């Protein structure tokens, strides 16, 4: 099937991003990836982007994402530093900056039908499949995406452009996501880059 004949769904991206470096003069951001996708003549992916500096702000925007008015933005992109099972929001020295899967599961309980969550963070997905499936069951989300390793910035940005773009050509369903996962592997010519990044897509059973 060629690009011209594939249906485009235009699944919007709701992106929350924290600071990557202590020096605020460093402009590093994932927004250029989203801007590129939004300006693509094929997909024109809509997106909402917010800078987040505190756990309080993070929870505020997380609740916004679950509202019906944002149903057209079913892809939640969380761009933060991470460790296994957690993301770090704001000053890592603060106890409340470590947002765990347990926290997210509690805040998003039953609110993620027909939605997916992408952790654009190091190692957050380096937990058991059993734990991820429990999260998916509790929240109703279709899938969790992210990394088990510490990916390089350029490689992950290039990969996420491909990943988010591919999601536009598949229904927001378990079967659609399985198709997207296989097509990403095919377009990368195998699984080597996926292994180097430690990428995984856990789809609800």
Show which residues each predicted segment covers.
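A structural signal for short, well-ordered beta-strand segments and their strand-loop junctions
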Residues: 15, 77, 118, 144-146, ...
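Caspase-like cysteine protease fold
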Residues: 97-107, 170-205
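Catalytic cores of nucleophile-dependent amide-cleaving enzymes
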Residues: 92-157
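Short, small-residue alpha-helix embedded
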Residues: 157-169
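A short acidic, often aromatic-flanked loop/helix-cap motif at beta-alpha or helix-coil junctions
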Residues: 53-59, 151-154, 202
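A domain-level signal for caspase-like cysteine endopeptidase catalytic cores
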Residues: 1-73, 81, 89-92, 114, ...
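Short glycine-rich anion-binding loops that position phosphate/pyrophosphate groups of nucleotides
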Residues: 79-84, 124
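Hydrophobic, Leu/Ile/Phe/Ala-enriched alpha-helical segments that form helix-helix packing faces
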Residues: 33-41, 62-69, 104-108, 135-136, ...
């Amino acid at each position: 099937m060629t690009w011209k004949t594939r249906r485009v769904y235009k699944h919007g991206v709701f992106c929350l991003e924290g600071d990557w470096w202590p020096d605020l003069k460093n402009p590093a951001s994932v927004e250029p990836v989203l801007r590129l996708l939004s300006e693509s003549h094929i997909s024109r992916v809509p997106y909402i982007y917010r800078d987040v500096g505190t756990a309080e702000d993070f929870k505020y925007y997380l609740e916004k994402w679950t509202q019906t008015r944002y149903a057209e933005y079913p892809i939640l992109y969380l761009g933060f530093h991470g460790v296994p099972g957690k993301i770090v929001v704001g000053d890592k020295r603060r106890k409340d900056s470590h947002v765990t899967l347990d926290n997210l599961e509690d805040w998003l309980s039953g609110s993620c039908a027909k939605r997916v969550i992408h952790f654009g963070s190091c190692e957050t997905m380096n937990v058991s499949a059993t734990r991820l499936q429990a999260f998916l069951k509790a929240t109703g989300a279709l899938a969790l995406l992210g990394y088990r390793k510490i990916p390089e910035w350029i490689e992950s940005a290039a990969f996420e452009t491909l990943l988010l773009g591919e999601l536009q050509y598949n229904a927001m369903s378990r079967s659609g996501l399985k198709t997207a996962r296989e097509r990403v592997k095919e377009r990368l010519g195998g699984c080597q880059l996926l292994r180097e990044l430690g990428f995984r897509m856990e789809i609800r059973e």
